[in-house]
């Protein structure tokens, strides 16, 4: 499989397969990395190329002072999709979990989209996690941050951002 490492602005990326007019942008989920796209590239090649990036604080970008949050990931994906649309005739998306959510924030629906375990309603997910933590939104608002059962933190600012920036409806 032909593999090319590149940067789109400052974003590390990998491009799989021989040149084609068709591209699949592969967006990994939490704890993922750009190299996860290889098995998918093996399936869609030679009819399409696959472009994958490391989202903030993932893959080759781990341990940097970057936040894995929608306000950092979505603008980056907007830039990557603009690059893709400038270089390929057809651009599609294959995204996993929170990667699907970030993609829906970042750009309008592509011709084709394949989602694996997508987060389709981030606000609902956060509210369910608030309930599971045994607190109310008021408590989260007052404290700002609260430990979630899963080991990460619930954030009032994150919830407010999600409410102020609804994801685009692709379906």
For the regions a language model picked out, list residue spans one by one.
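A short loop-to-beta-strand scaffold at the N-terminal edge of the catalytic core in hydrolase folds
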Residues: 7-17
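Short beta-strand element of the alpha/beta-hydrolase
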Residues: 21-29
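The serine-hydrolase catalytic nucleophile loop
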Residues: 30-42
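Conserved alpha/beta-hydrolase
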Residues: 44-63
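Short beta-strand immediately N-terminal to the catalytic nucleophile in serine-hydrolase-like folds
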Residues: 90-95, 116
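Gly/Ala-rich beta-loop-alpha elbow adjacent to hydrolase catalytic centers
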Residues: 94-103
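The alpha/beta-hydrolase serine catalytic core
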Residues: 110-171
